[in-house]
Amino acid sequence: MRYFSRLTTTTLLLAAFFEPRLSEAQRTINSTLTLPTELPTGNYDLEVFGNFSTVLAIANPPDERNTLYFAERSGRIIVYSDLENQIREQDPFLVIPSTVTTNGENGLLGLAFHPQYRLNGYFFVFYTSQRESGERTNRVSRFRRSQSDPFLADPDSETILFDQVDQANNHNGGDIHFGPDGYLYISLGDEGAGNDAYQNSQVTNGDFFAGLARIDVDRLPANIEPTEQPDAPRDSEGKAYYSVPVDNPLVSRWQEGGGDPESDLRLEFYAIGLRNPWRMSFDPATGDLWTGDVGQGAREEIDIITKGGNYGWAFREGFIGGPRSQTPPLGFETVVEPIHDYPRSQGTSITGGVVYRGSRLPELEGAYIFGDYGSNRIWALFPDPNGVSPNIEQITSVSNPVAFARDPSNGDILICSLSGTIRRLVRGSGKEPVFPETLTQTGAFKSLITLEPENGIIA
């Protein structure tokens, strides 16, 4: 903490200038020293917000500051209809009617509300399912709010956008958010196992893995139909249930090549080179998209995602080399370094967080709050405006953090644990000692010119 840095510096200065002497005389009592006599009790506390069954995503409809929805791993979505009075609806907003697999890293992983939710009632989920054949899939679906009750969804309204076979039960990504541009962003892992076992990284003409997709769920006229993909269902007119933004990185290359609708080029990709992007979020003030990407055995990393960015997996892991030798594919030649990475001595599985934009902890304004599932540490990352290394401070710890969110009513940080408990980050209850800002204010010296100490400083 910054407090300890100041205290240590002053203590070392005093020790460097003065050498203690033993004396048989009675020690003089000092009455001028203003250094605090107690250590700080901690800047932050954690208040229990509520208990659930492993929440992996929290979301609220746009412009609704007093409601919040909690996506449980099992496939249930719970709603707090009145945050101010802590009113939790007795019935779940939705229980996904299809089979939701929950082994490994599977489950209901993502939840996002359409920007026009108040008008159309649409919301979207990412969950893992299983076909009758036994194949496990990653599924993105759209549901609709019930017409009879604003705090219930229609379970029969599911429309599947894509339902992709996945051979492993880890590295699913699965977070979804609408960006400031109105498009849906989807995080995608490399399918699982180690060393990019299924060889999905740096591949843009295969399946939806190892990157981040951006799609248009409104199918605006300016955007284009995706290329044919067996795992993306079509409507009665042969159209996909989404379109591809015309400015996605691969679209111009595809169009220049003739625009073959049967091409295997996956135009949905917005960024690639991610191993297991576990939790991402937009900064509401800047629009930056922050992502925590889980490493393999050496580094955990934080990235700010940009259009066309290549984040290096599997030839990079954080700032160091990765397990494979690869050439970036066309359209994603720009390799983007992480904002920050850290070694296994600090943690083993990053959980991406959120940028703090609340009002009750002003010293955290603009800081990215994130954690590590393995070490239980919660950090604040303060970006450097000049682009040099950010400042990182551990601010608390939480057992097995799996997701972060903001309370829309006040901007507070909410932290989800694997156990199901959700905690709120608040100001510490202990009184913070007041530390003098200058040597004069310490009361340790009679004169700063001669550095003669006050009576009682040296026995």
Name each region found by the language model.
Residues 193-207:
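Acidic/polar, solvent-exposed loop segments in beta-strand-rich repeat domains
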